Amino acid sequence: MTAMTRKARPAGLVAIDREMARQRSDALASYRQAFESAAKVAASLKKTGRALLLGMGGSHAVNRAVEPLYRDLGIDAVALPLSEQLGQPLPLTGKTVLISSQSGESAEVVRWFSETGGTADTFGLTLEGGSFLARTATCLVGAGGTELAFAATRSLTVTFALHLAILAALGQDPAAAFAALEAPSEIDVEPALAALRKVATVVTSGRRLQGVAEALSLGLVELSRRPCFSLEGGQLRHGPMEMLGPEIGVILFRGDDATAGLVTAMASSVLEAGAPVVMFDCSSAAPVEGAVTLRFSPASGMAAIFAMLPVAQRLMIAFADERVENAGTPVRSTKITRSE
């Protein structure tokens, strides 16, 4: 009799596992240690009333996710890739600039400061206290140090916690977000994995939670090396519906907010086109028949983000592990992107 052998966990995924195992504790510690810097950022935002959120990769996805949360507090917030700001810059006068970079060493970060010199209202969010960004600007520094594994997991959660500190300093109640962070969901991702097993491409989409959708699509691409991309719900509706079919998997994010009905309508349309749908659902609405629904307690904003994010991370890792032998070990990229 030949004993069945299990596939060894790839080294890259083991490294990600280590990051994820401490992301909640690091996020909580990051929030608690950020009070002083968060108060400075909040004071600047109250003075300017405008925020320019700059970052690359996963940092930009975080910025997209928190963009509506700042707007809810009356801040005119705009999130742009830092590369776009370098090439087609928005004016900086009268704005609070928040630059996010987990390493604090990205090529775009270094060039931006070299070309602009920064401003008195420029702040950073990073995981590395000794980085270029931390040395150059007043920074909120996350706990736990630099994320070593490829594909952002802990760095996303920690950066969200740093933003939560700023939002709390602006007057937002962090209680619901804390509750979601302290009690992670153990939702089984296998039904979602099964629904996506035969797809060649994944599209992620949301409305107010579009930033989370973008973070997941980036992780899926990095780990699975399959084409995965994200379209905001309205943008998906305007033309790209033509691509839908059984080989295109669609992952939707629905929160307990005013845009939930639009996400529901999109799920129905995608199913009518014959494409499998996975729904990350923090809404109070009924599940969409035919969609695989990962159901969370009703939540919106940062509470929904903290509830959904670790489950989305587990899904992207499992999706990649089924398709790539050495998932988590990059073949064309590096953890810190030092070139443009």
Language-model regions: role of each:
Residues 67, 217-218, 267, 317:
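Short glycine-/small-residue-rich flexible loop motifs, especially phosphate/cofactor-binding loops
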Residues 99, 206, 305:
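Active-site-adjacent beta-strand anchor residues
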Residues 12-49, 139-249, 259-260, 323-340:
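Active-site phosphate/pyrophosphate-binding segments
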Residues 46-188, 241, 249-298:
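Glycine-rich phosphate-binding loops that contact phosphosugars or nucleotide phosphates
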